[in-house]
């Protein structure tokens, strides 16, 4: 992969910045080494031990470490990764997004979807409608105030607002970092939370990806072209179907060999994500459709395939958080800060409400002091991937502003849940015990 990036760098112009005089190929190598090292470190046993600490788990769940590392490497910090270097790293970002889409798409197996309880479908639809409406409304208000004549070009706002709405849908499915007291009831509730998060992830990628299909990106002069959207969708479906059938055949030949299976999957992702990127389509959406095709064609190899993919899930998430840090915009004024914190605040108010309603429908009573009440507050890492996909499809100031807002919302919501949980535990702790803890 690094060799391919270095070869591709021959045609990438060197951008001005902190790396003047340093060969661009070497700078790409250093950037891959730094971001790749961060991703690999996230999956080590030492990192897993660190995550047992509540503060470390909270910071990493919101992507703080990786985002700060990306900011340090980007134009805001050391300027190791400037615009020219990011162009050289683009293939790596495309493959990473395709990988994430594939993991989510593999959950959309028809037999599994048929077995999903009605309460989870109800929860997903209700939460998606409310969350998308709130996020899009906040985005329209803030951008209307921050961007001059923003509503004079509604087509330019279509994909960004849809992306912002999609980023606000899902939540982090893991509950281990919340330090929940284990019981049969909390295990059932945690399972429902994870299942609904997976379903929301599918909806989020589909919403953002499909909304970008008819957009002919040209900054503020972007236009909507339904015929272009139809052609792009046809390309996506044809690529996913043809390559999926071929991958299914190859996977059946190597299902007992994990390394060979990984090679097949990486090649599969490179093809579908690369075709999508060349056609101006979100690699995240192409990965999702490819995963759906593969999940519904495969039988035996699927279980082994999922285990192979999930081994790299944490590393992939950290890699995308790092890229998000590189791409954040510091020249957008107050808009990203206001929008990010506003979305985080609405998540704190809205998500526990929809969670509580859904648990009542499922006849599961949430304990008043359980941290699970706050589980859906934390923005899913997928939100960052959705925002990065928008930047790849439409690299504009508006797209980077929304990416920055999504990153801020993720960091804030990632801290809000543990802080509220800590406050609840502190308020219920006996006064006499507090002295002995010091």
Where are each of the predicted segments found?
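Short, strongly hydrophobic alpha-helical membrane anchors
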Residues: 1-24
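Structural signature of hydrophobic alpha-helical transmembrane segments
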Residues: 21-38, 85-102, 151-170, 228-240, ...
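Transmembrane alpha-helical segments of multi-pass membrane transport proteins and ion-pumping complexes
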Residues: 32-45, 67-75, 79-80, 95-107, ...
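Transmembrane alpha-helices that form the ion-translocation and gating core
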Residues: 40-53, 62, 67, 110-184, ...
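Membrane-interface junctions of multi-pass transporters
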Residues: 49-61, 65, 72-119, 251-257, ...
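Alpha-helical transmembrane bundle and helix-membrane interface signal
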Residues: 110-115, 147, 175-234, 252-253
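Membrane-interface alpha-helices at helix entry/exit sites of multi-pass transporters
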Residues: 116-122, 184-206, 221-227, 302-307, ...
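Short, highly charged, low-complexity non-transmembrane loops/tails of multi-pass membrane proteins
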Residues: 427-438
């Amino acid at each position: 992969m690094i060799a391919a990036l270095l070869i591709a760098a021959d045609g990438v112009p060197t951008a001005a910045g902190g790396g003047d005089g340093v060969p661009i190929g070497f700078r790409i190598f250093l950037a891959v080494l730094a971001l790749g090292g961060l991703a690999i470190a996230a999956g080590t046993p030492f990192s897993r031990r660190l995550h047992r600490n509540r503060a470390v788990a909270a910071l990493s769940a919101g992507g703080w470490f990786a985002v700060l590392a990306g900011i340090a490497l980007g134009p805001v910090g050391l300027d190791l990764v400037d615009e020219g270097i990011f162009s050289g790293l683009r293939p790596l970002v495309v493959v990473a997004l395709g990988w994430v889409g594939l993991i989510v798409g593999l959950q959309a197996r028809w037999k599994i979807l048929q077995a999903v309880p009605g309460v989870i479908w109800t929860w997903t639809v209700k939460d998606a409608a409310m969350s998308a409406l709130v996020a899009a409304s906040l985005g329209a208000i803030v951008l209307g105030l921050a961007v001059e004549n923003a509503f004079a070009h509604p087509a330019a706002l279509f994909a960004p607002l849809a992306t912002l709405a999609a980023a606000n849908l899902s939540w982090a499915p893991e509950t281990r970092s919340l330090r929940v007291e284990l019981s049969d009831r909390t295990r059932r509730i945690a399972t429902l939370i994870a299942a609904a998060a997976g379903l929301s992830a599918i909806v989020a990628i589909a919403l953002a990806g499909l909304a970008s299909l008819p957009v002919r990106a040209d900054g503020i002069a972007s236009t909507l072209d339904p015929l272009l959207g139809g052609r792009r969708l046809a390309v996506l479906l044809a690529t996913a179907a043809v390559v999926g059938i071929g991958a299914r055949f190859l996977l059946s030949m190597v299902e007992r060999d994990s390394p060979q299976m990984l090679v097949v999957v990486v090649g599969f992702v490179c093809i579908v994500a690369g075709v999508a990127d060349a056609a101006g389509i979100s690699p995240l959406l192409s990965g999702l459709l490819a995963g759906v095709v593969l999940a519904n064609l495969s039988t035996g190899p699927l279980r082994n395939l999922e285990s192979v993919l999930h081994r790299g899930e944490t590393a992939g998430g950290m890699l995308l958080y790092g890229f998000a840090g590189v791409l954040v915009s510091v020249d957008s004024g107050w808009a990203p800060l206001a929008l990010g914190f506003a979305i985080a605040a609405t998540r704190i108010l809205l998500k526990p409400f929809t969670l509580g309603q859904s648990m009542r429908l499922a006849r599961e009573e949430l304990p008043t002091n359980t941290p699970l009440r706050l589980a859906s507050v934390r923005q899913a890492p997928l939100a960052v991937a959705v925002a990065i996909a928008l930047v790849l499809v439409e690299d504009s100031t508006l797209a980077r502003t929304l990416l920055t807002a999504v990153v801020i919302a993720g960091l804030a919501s990632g801290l809000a849940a543990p802080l509220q949980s800590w406050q609840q535990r502190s308020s219920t702790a006996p006064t006499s015990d507090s002295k002995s803890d010091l």
